[in-house]
Amino acid sequence: MADTVENAVSTPDVEQPWAELGLSADEYQRIREILGRRPTGGELAMYSVMWSEHCSYKSSKKYLRRFGDLPQQTPLGPLLAGIGDNAGVVDIGNGLAVTFKAESHNHPSYVEPHQGAATGVGGIVRDIMAMGARPVGVMNALAFGPLDAPDTARVLPGVVSGIADYGNCLGLPTIGGQTLFDPTYYGNPLVNALCVGVLRHEDLQFAKASGVGNLVVLFGAATGGDGIGGASILASESFAAEGESKRPSVQVGDPFMEKLLIECTLDLFNAGVVEALQDFGAAGISCATSELASAGDGGMHVELDRVPLRDPNLAPEEILMSESQERMAAVVRPDQLDRFMEICAHWGVAATVIGEVTDTGRLHIDWQGERIVDVDPRTVAHDGPVLDMPAARPWWIDELNEDDANALPRDNSGEGLAGALLALVGSAQLCDRSWITDQYDRFVRGNTVLAQPNDAGMIRIDDNLGIALSLDANGRQTTLNPYLGAQLALCEAYRNVAVSGATPVAVTDCLNYGSPYDPDVMWQFDETILGLVDGCRELGVPVTGGNVSLHNRTGDESIRPTPLVGVLGVIDDVHRRIPSAFAHDGDAVLLLGTTKCEFGGSVYEDVIHAGHLGGMPPMPDLNAEKALAAVMVEASKRGLLSSAHDLSDGGLAQALVESCLQGGLGVSVSLPEGEPSVMLFSETPARAIVSLCGNGYREFKELCQEHGVPTARIGEVIDHGEIEVNGLFSLPLDEIERAWRKPIPTAMGE
């Protein structure tokens, strides 16, 4: 028998499993004060999940508010939607807008790698749909333990196949991403997914239930027991003891249903029969109903027993908490219901009226004619606790910073430099990712202009207009200094977009950290936010939204602080895009920017010095990044460049290797004056290499001078397969390529 509101009033002292559901004693007491009684089982289920770290951001909210202090303006105009909405929306002109967002699915992807990663893709796609947009592309950023670790061989293939199967079935190109390997991710991989969508301004949707008498329609997949965690405790121990006890499970995705749901939803938008829309993500119906109702101007009444079920034995608390995938909730006017149902039927998508908008200001949920939930929806969705967790600068960080990576020995002989280059390209950090990326369809839909292994992914929006995206993170640099590390991730993503020829306009993030109960972690988080806010303000790009994932740890060891930063760019003419591959024999190769001795957190430090981490990370130069971006965007418009590649992991050496291997051409260079290993392997930011034909050299050099970007002509593209560093060494490309391609297939047993 369901625990009703009437029963809760008459039995105030019933023992409830609030602690098992993750609530503190103070939080449980606050719920009782809000309600003026004990919560019912359904109410306790809703509050527990909506006040969880995952849904409420209770440990991070006070820091995240700083993003709201940034100007809500992009270089192209005001944001159309931002933090607090399902996804940020950016005006790109001509009545068009782009929405994009990144989210994490870390813990489910360790428990069940394939389904965990697949449903991570599905969830972020529905967030984009909920804004009224057609999803047009996805990206991912992954982090695993050591490549040769036994569990990596289990987790990595499952995660990659899950992403590939779901994204490919949806017909969405996977246009880019990143894969990291580091011991701290062993036992706690990171699976961060990004989706981008396109819409017209008039199609923008918000999750706001308004209009008394309007109907609440659930459409999509039936509801099952997958994804239930805390609610199973309520159902099996307290409220449905006779039912089957269900252990927490990872959600199960159905990409074919999601594809139907996408097309159905877009048809519903086009028909004008949707007043508001919300996807079913974490917390399922609990989240969708409370967020819709709290953002509206009235209340909502839901009849829970109308929800179509895959498992007829689910208790009401489980239905409220189920995270079954491929479900949406729409608010529909009664006179539009028939047309709404016709469109759903056309696509084979089940749709059921489960409630209506009311004028009560309350969220009422009934089960078989009895009230099991009676709450102010805002107290569930928005008024959760805001914690002030202790934060303290770690005692160990001074010692770490004093262990200067720049002081480590470096072999500057020709043989030593060649050996270092081969070691770096053959390392897990820099080796070929095609074993991963070849499983993704990068060109489905026919609008992909650039994709991996280019610096940014680029998609055509119309005949000429395009968007570019990049995702970047570096946990090693952020460990050394979280403020600077966050800015370095921002700068790299910003730079990757710019070197493709696009103007960077907006930012999303996915902040992956350890336990919020660890003061070291919260200090790292605080410093990260400060770094991102200051960096975004200086670069002139707003943070449109994102995600926080805490409790990423194995035993007592937290992962490295890993802020993933995604940058969106806009390019007026995709035909002027700049690829990263060398294209023409005889093209001049130029190094842009200033190179300093900066090895802290670098791949050279890690690989050559057996995992060493120490010193300070490279110093970001935000003004130099803006100047470099301005040069690259203008050079793209003028069609001056054959190729461009940013310098980051592995420095100049790795950029040369990648541009050669992608283009099937060699390069002959003479290093600028200075220590050869610094010139080749330092990771100073705000740098790029470009190639161009001779008749554009003077114009490009003048452009760089106009913006104050240092340039050095270091060599030329050659038509035979070698990388020649004059006076030091020469390596055949086929030898480099063998070292580069080998690590991941070998680790995967191929």
UniProtKB/Swiss-Prot annotation:
It is an enzyme of class 6 (ligase). GO terms for biological process: 'de novo' IMP biosynthetic process. One of its GO terms (molecular function) is ATP binding. Substrate binds at S104, H105, N106, H107, R126, Q251, E323, S324, Q325, S549. It catalyses: N(2)-formyl-N(1)-(5-phospho-beta-D-ribosyl)glycinamide + L-glutamine + ATP + H2O = 2-formamido-N(1)-(5-O-phospho-beta-D-ribosyl)acetamidine + L-glutamate + ADP + phosphate + H(+). Mg(2+) 2 binds at D127, D279. Its EC number is 6.3.5.3. GO terms for cellular component: cytoplasm. It comes from the Bacteria. Monomer. Part of the FGAM synthase complex composed of 1 PurL, 1 PurQ and 2 PurS subunits. Belongs to the FGAMS family. This is Phosphoribosylformylglycinamidine synthase subunit PurL. It comes from Cutibacterium acnes (strain DSM 16379 / KPA171202). The gene is purL.
